[in-house]
């Protein structure tokens, strides 16, 4: 059973490979929105994984996000689920 209030936080340093320029979602060397969404989904998956039986997983079905500020290479971002 999933425990209400369980939280999981993942941290990710921003590297050149994780920029909008690298993924093609923009031209600037800042943290790309597709990578932000992936980090958010990964935090949710990581949080749920300990409650699931072996061989089971979770899937994302909907995202509503707002990417409000650029994060340059060298800084760290985090997602909490």
Question: Predicted regions: what is each one?
Answer:
Residues 1-32:
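Catalytic strand-loop segment that frames the active site of acyl-thioester-processing enzymes
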Residues 30-35, 72:
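Residues at secondary-structure transition points
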Residues 44-78:
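Hydrophobic beta-strand-centered segment that forms part of the acyl-chain substrate-binding groove
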Residues 81:
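Conserved catalytic core of two-component histidine kinases
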